[in-house]
Curated annotation (Swiss-Prot):
Family of this protein: Belongs to the STXBP/unc-18/SEC1 family.
Protein transport found in the keyword field: yes
Further details from the record: Present with 5660 molecules/cell in log phase SD medium.
Top-level taxon of origin: Eukaryota
Quaternary structure and partners: Interacts with PEP7 and TLG2.
Keyword Cell wall biogenesis/degradation tagged: no
Gene Ontology CC entries for this record: cytosol; Golgi membrane; SNARE complex; vacuolar membrane
GO MF term list: SNARE binding; unfolded protein binding
Record keywords: Cytoplasm, Membrane, Protein transport, Transport, Vacuole
Xref: InterPro entries: Sec-1-like_dom1, Sec-1-like_dom3a, Sec1-like, Sec1-like_dom2, Sec1-like_sf
GO biological process annotation, one example: protein targeting to vacuole
Protein name, UniProt field: Vacuolar protein sorting-associated protein 45
Primary role: Essential for vacuolar protein sorting. Function in membrane traffic between the Golgi and the vacuole.
Length: 577
C-alpha cells in the first residue's frame, strides 16, 4: 500500500520497455528514446521521476503530444504515456497517420476501450506501434499514503448535491485506477446521507463488476479491503483551522502545487530559490520533518544547519592531493546538502514571518478553543475582541465567525451579536457568505458523529494515536492542536470493525449489492479513504501516524478530489450553487 512503490513500478515499466525491433536493427541512435506525454501525464511523471532518473534510461527528450511543432526524428524510439481521453486520442491518431518517430510503444494511464484500440489500429497504416499497454496511475501521488485527483468542486459538481456528468466519470475512472494500481477489489462503504457519495460508490461498483474478469480477478485476501467514500462537508471544521505541521503549513501560507513551492513573492529571496521542489520521496530532510509541528521543526532545522556547517568545515581542509580527491568525490553530495539547507531555511523563515504579520498565534488559539468547546463564554468574549481588532485581516474574522457557528448553532442571541459585529467589520458579500455557511451546515445531520459518541472515552489505540493532541495538556503544542479531525475516530472505528452502521452503507462488490446495516465479518487490512470535496495535509498526517501505530496490521491510504488549504475550502463553499 505504498504509493511511491506503485509509481516506481509503473515508471520503471515504461522507461525499461524494450524495442520490438530485432537486435540487429537496433543501432546506437535507436537506444535513445523520446518520452511523449499529454497534459494529464506530464504532472504525473514530474511527481514520480526526476530528469536524472529518465536520463539513466536513455530518455533524452520529453515532449507533449499537444505540441504540433515537434521535429521529425525517425531514428528515435518513442515511449508514449498518455491518458485515454478523447482529446488525447485525437492527437495520437494524427501522430500515427504521420509518424515523427521510428517506433511507438504506447502506455495508457487507465483502462482503454475496445473502440479506442480499434481506432488506433486503423490509423497505424505504417505499423509504427509495437506495443500498447494499460498501466494504472490516473491520479497524483503526493505522499507514500496520500493521493489527489487535483479537481476543484466546480469541475465535478453541478451543485453541492449533484455530480456533473463529466465530473462523475473522471472521479470514477481515477478511483478505479487507484484500486487497480494497488491490486485490490474492495467492499465499498459510503456515507448514506450523502447523495454524491452514494452515486460515486455505485458507479465504482458498476465499473468493478464490468471489468471483473479482465482487471479485478485478484487472489482472495485474508480480509476484504475497504474503500470508504466520505463527504467533506460532514467535517467542515478541519479544513477551516490553521494547520501547525510542516507540510500543511507550507500549503497554507505559501502553497504546494504538485510538489512545487513558489517562493518568488518572499521578500529578498535568492533567485535560485524562487521555485523549489519539495518531495518526501527525494528530500530526506523533508521526509523526516513533514509531519512535525512548528516547534519541533525549529529544532530539526537547527540540527540540519549544524550538520551542514560541520560538513563545510570538514570539506574545507584541503591540504593534499588526497584531500582534493576526497573533496571532488564528495562534492555532489555536499552541493546537494548546501542547496537543501538554503531551501528549508527560506521556507521556515517565510512561515515564521507570516505567522507574525498575520497574528496567527493568537488567531489559531481562539480557533482551537472554539472548535473544542461548546458555548464557552470566555471563548466568545475572546472572539468578539479579535473581531473588533483592526490589526486582524478580514479573512480571518470571517473564518472565526464560521468556526463559532458550527459549534454554537442554538445560541441565537450570540449569533445575532456576531452578525452585528460582522456587518460593521466586513463587506456585505462576506456577511452574506457567513449566512450561507451557517445555513449550509445548520442542516447537517447529527448522525455524522461516529458511534464513539456513545462512549466518550477513546480506546487505548486512539489515546496513543492522539496523545500529542490531548487538550487537557498544558503544553504549547496542544493549545494549537486541540481539534482532532473526524478521520481519527473513523480510523479507530475501522480498526475495531465498529463503523457506525446507521451512517455508512455498504456495497458488497462480490454480489454488487447494497447490504445496508449488516456487520462486516473481518477487520480490513487494507483501507482506502476517499473524500469528495478534498482532504487536508493535517488529515494526511493522522493517516501516516495511524499506519505507524498499526505496524502493518492495518494499512490506510488517503485520497481526495483535491488537497485543501483553508482559503480553498472557503472558496469552494463561496462558489457552490
Amino acid at each position: 500500500m505504498n504509493l511511491f512503490d506503485v509509481a516506481d513500478f509503473y515508471i520503471n515499466k515504461i522507461v525499461t520497455s524494450q524495442s520490438k525491433l530485432s537486435v540487429a536493427n537496433v543501432n546506437e541512435h535507436q537506444r535513445i528514446k523520446v518520452l511523449l506525454l499529454d497534459k494529464n501525464t506530464t504532472p504525473t511523471i514530474s511527481l514520480c521521476a526526476t530528469q536524472s532518473e529518465l536520463l539513466k534510461h536513455e530518455i533524452y527528450l520529453v515532449e507533449r503530444i499537444e505540441n504540433e511543432q515537434r521535429e521529425v526524428s525517425r531514428h528515435l524510439r518513442c515511449l508514449v504515456y498518455v491518458k485515454p481521453t478523447e482529446e488525447t486520442l485525437q492527437h495520437l491518431l494524427r501522430e500515427l497517420r504521420n509518424p515523427r518517430y521510428g517506433e511507438y510503444q504506447i502506455f495508457f494511464s487507465n483502462i482503454v476501450s475496445k473502440s479506442q484500440l480499434e481506432r488506433l489500429a486503423e490509423s497505424d497504416d505504417l505499423e509504427a506501434v509495437t506495443k500498447v499497454e494499460e498501466i494504472f496511475q490516473d491520479f497524483f501521488i503526493l505522499n507514500q499514503d496520500l493521493f489527489s485527483f487535483d479537481l476543484q468542486p466546480r469541475e465535478f459538481l453541478s451543485n453541492k448535491l449533484v455530480w456533473s456528468e463529466g465530473g462523475l466519470t473522471k472521479c470514477t475512472n481515477s478511483l478505479v485506477s487507484v484500486l487497480l494500481s494497488l491490486k485490490i477489489k474492495p467492499d465499498i462503504r459510503y456515507e448514506g446521507a450523502s447523495k454524491i457519495c452514494e452515486r460515486l460508490a455505485k458507479e465504482v461498483s458498476y465499473e468493478i463488476g464490468k471489468n471483473e474478469r479482465t482487471f479485478f480477478d485478484f487472489p482472495v485476501m485474508d480480509s476484504t479491503p475497504v474503500l470508504l467514500i466520505l463527504d467533506r462537508n460532514t467535517d467542515p471544521i478541519t479544513p477551516l483551522l490553521q494547520p501547525w505541521t510542516y507540510q500543511s503549513m507550507i500549503n497554507e501560507y505559501i502553497g504546494i502545487k504538485r510538489n512545487i513551492v513558489d517562493l518568488s513573492k518572499v521578500p529578498r529571496i535568492d533567485k535560485d530559490l524562487e521555485k523549489v521542489t519539495l518531495s518526501s520521496k527525494q528530500d530526506a530532510f523533508f521526509r523526516d520533518t513533514m509531519y512535525l509541528n512548528f516547534g519541533e521543526l525549529g529544532d530539526k532545522v537547527k540540527q540540519y544547519v549544524t550538520t551542514y556547517k560541520d560538513k563545510t568545515q570538514t570539506n574545507s581542509q584541503i591540504n593534499s592531493i588526497e584531500d582534493i580527491k576526497n573533496f571532488i568525490e564528495k562534492y555532489p553530495e555536499f552541493r546537494k546538502l548546501s542547496g537543501n539547507v538554503a531551501k528549508h531555511m527560506a521556507i521556515v523563515g517565510e512561515l515564521d514571518r507570516q505567522l507574525k504579520i498575520k497574528n496567527i498565534w493568537e488567531i489559531s488559539e481562539i480557533e482551537q478553543n472554539l472548535s473544542a468547546h461548546d458555548a464557552n463564554e470566555e471563548d466568545f468574549s475572546d472572539l468578539i475582541k479579535l473581531l473588533q481588532n483592526e490589526a486582524v485581516d478580514k479573512y480571518y474574522k470571517l473564518k472565526l465567525a464560521c468556526i463559532y457557528s458550527l459549534n454554537n448553532q442554538t445560541s441565537s442571541d450570540k449569533i445575532r451579536q456576531l452578525v452585528e459585529i460582522l456587518s460593521q467589520q466586513l463587506p456585505p458579500e462576506d456577511v452574506n457568505f457567513f449566512h450561507k455557511f451557517k445555513s449550509l451546515f445548520s442542516r447537517q445531520d447529527k448522525m455524522t458523529q461516529s458511534n464513539h459518541d456513545k462512549d466518550d472515552i477513546l480506546t487505548e489505540l486512539a489515546r496513543r494515536f492522539n496523545s500529542r493532541m490531548n487538550s487537557k495538556s498544558n503544553t504549547a503544542e496542544n493549545v494549537y492542536m486541540q481539534h482532532i479531525p473526524e478521520i481519527s475516530s473513523l480510523l479507530t472505528d475501522l480498526s475495531k470493525n465498529a463503523l457506525f452502521r446507521d451512517r455508512f452503507k455498504e456495497i458488497d462488490t462480490q454480489g454488487h449489492r447494497v447490504i445496508g446495516n449488516q456487520q462486516s465479518k473481518d477487520i480490513p487490512q487494507d483501507v482506502i479513504l476517499f473524500v469528495i470535496g478534498g482532504v487536508t495535509y493535517e488529515e494526511a498526517r493522522l493517516v501516516h501516524d495511524f499506519n505507524g501505530t498499526m505496524n502493518n496490521r492495518m494499512r490506510v491510504v488517503l485520497g481526495g478530489t483535491s488537497i485543501l488549504s483553508t482559503k480553498e475550502y472557503m472558496d469552494s463553499i463561496r462558489s457552490a450553487k
